[in-house]
Amino acid sequence: MASVASARWLRVSCGLCVPLTARRAGPCGRTPSSRFYSGSAAVPKDEGADIAGTEEVVIPKKKTWDKVAVLQALASTVHRDTTAAPYAFQDDPYLIPTSSVESHSFLLAKKSGENAAKFIINSYPKYFQKDIAEPHIPCLMPEYFEPQIEEISEAALQERIKLKKVKASVDIFDQLLQAGTTVSLETTNSLLDLLCYYGNQEPSTNYNFQQHEQTEELEEAEEGDNMKSKKKAGHQLGVTWRARNHAERIFALMPEKNAHSYCTMIRGMVKHRAHTQALSMYTELLNNRLRADVHTFNSLIEATALVVNAKFEEKWNNILDLLKQMVAQNVKPNLQTFNTILKCLRRFYAFGKLPALQTFREMKAIGIEPSLATYHHIIQLFYQHESPSKGSSLIIYDIMDEITGKTFSPKDPDDDMFFQSAMRVCSSLRDLELAYQVHGLLNTGDNRKFIGPDPRRNFYYSKFFSLLCLMEQIDVTLKWYKDLIPSVFFPHSQTLIDLLQALDVANRLEMIPQIWKDSKEYGHTFRSDLKEEILMLMARDQHPPELQAAFADCAADIKSTYESQDARQTASEWPANSLNYIAILFLRAGRTQEAWKMLGLFRKHNKIPRNELLNEFMDSAKASSSPAQAVEVVKLANSFSLPICEGLTQRLTADFTLSQEQKEALGDLTALTSDSESDSDSDTSKDK
């Protein structure tokens, strides 16, 4: 089998260069030679066949179970409680978050507490010597960071390297050289490993956590077409390779260098963005007739793609040259090799599509099983824009047909990016069936572990639920709403707006008060766009009296959010639309006193009322036989010089019996209106 795989890999020099013309453009075309079947069970041809030659089944005397097998069996019998908060937030009921902001703060506080506990344990290890865990859990015990060997020796150097003391390790190495002591090649390589991994700087206590966060920011910046975010994310990575640093100095002082020494330097340079220096170091490695390992080749492929001022053809040819050198040096590629190539091809946009398909086919031809990160890179390459074009690729359907029903295990750091990118494509294509297929894959086996951290999980479910609101029947959408929110994720205000629009299409507006109640619970009390959407839907049409009363109560609650001012939140300014909608809802529910109070807010906040609102106020005044209220409506329209003022005045004189005082007031308003119109006409004639 190894010889067959090597023979297949030898075709890389030509297989990746020939354009595909007669084969399908999808990445999942199955090749018979790339299929592998397990031969663990022999099936007899028929019942009468001779079974003497069949394989004998051997029953093992003892079955070795995993230490957590019982826990796994118990966990498989328990399903998610849709009414409970996520497991990470199950603490004191008062502390359970109710919004995405609070959940993020909760997780940060929890991580801060863990770091504080580790600091105390490691600072005072003598008080934490009792080990009560069975089996032993190393991460719960103190870590000893203080060196025990005081004299200057190679053993002391090895101890400080193990403790990740960068500066102390370099100092002892220099002292050993000054004393004329020869440091072994193995120890020197270990020191190079330390320096190249941390970029010649002391690692912080939460180095791994910071690296994970910074890598996520850089990945999100690459996926978005935003140059500012790319520069910001790249700047935050901080550590860059500096010329003539400790690693280069120690490497130059080494009397003997092996392949490990060169490979460590190359990988350190690539990690800290010294791509040109890494390629030069590889040339030096070849000149010394040494061979690089597969991990070094993976780093060199990345460095080749990131070299500035080089065109696509040049970069791709250089990558192919590296692959040919792998064949010449008898270095077999691994999954990371192909994933690195696909990730680099994403930088080439449309030029990288055909090489990506060729790379994927070659990958499967030599028997390497793709991971979720492989499909993620292909999706990101073929669907780089949010809105689908007229000739969008259908490759996402081939991918889902290939992997539906499969259970994946972690193989690549980017595996947890797949579901986010796949659901983004489903949303852009407006394909609900495909979204269900992706969600079904997520719930297959332990694939849920690849949903990613909290921001990616929220992105995935927000896209999924928004697509449900757009394409699914309202009853099914509401079932998903109860199942996912808030037990799985906390909705953004736009998610709730999508749900409101789905309720509007299905004529289920009676649920709007409940949606507003949920919005307050999820921390969207001060979201003006959400409140305006709710008010608009309630005020757009006439409804039965019971529903109008519920809408008026909801409008009064929304009105209180504009009037109140929390200690942490400045009061929102009154939008004109919200004033109009709330006043209309009060009028239709028969809450006339509250509605007439809204007229004063128009003057107070200098907002112009709509003509429909003024007409409804006139209807309300007529229904209550109140000419005084009608006069107030005319005064309000006149104060804003609205064109409808003349029509309202005519309605006032025709529909109401006015007192002498009211007639005089109305005459004054008419005179002021005519004077203002004559002044405007004279100004217009002068301009002419």
UniProtKB/Swiss-Prot annotation:
The keyword Repeat applies. Its main location: mitochondrion. It is found in: Mitochondrion. PPR repeats lie at residues 149-183, 184-219, 258-292, 293-333, 334-370, 371-412, 415-449, 457-491, 492-526, 575-609. GO terms for biological process: mitochondrial translation; regulation of translation. The modification N6-acetyllysine is found at K126. Residues 667-688 are annotated as: Disordered. GO terms for molecular function: ribosomal small subunit binding; rRNA binding. Residues 1-37 form a transit peptide. The keyword Ribonucleoprotein applies. GO terms for cellular component: mitochondrial inner membrane; mitochondrion; ribonucleoprotein complex; ribosome. Keywords: Acetylation, Mitochondrion, Repeat, Ribonucleoprotein, Ribosomal protein, RNA-binding, rRNA-binding, Transit peptide, Translation regulation. Component of the mitochondrial ribosome small subunit (28S) which comprises a 12S rRNA and about 30 distinct proteins. Associated with the 12S mitochondrial rRNA (12S mt-rRNA). Mitochondrial RNA-binding protein that has a role in mitochondrial translation. Belongs to the mitochondrion-specific ribosomal protein mS39 family. This is Small ribosomal subunit protein mS39. The gene is PTCD3.
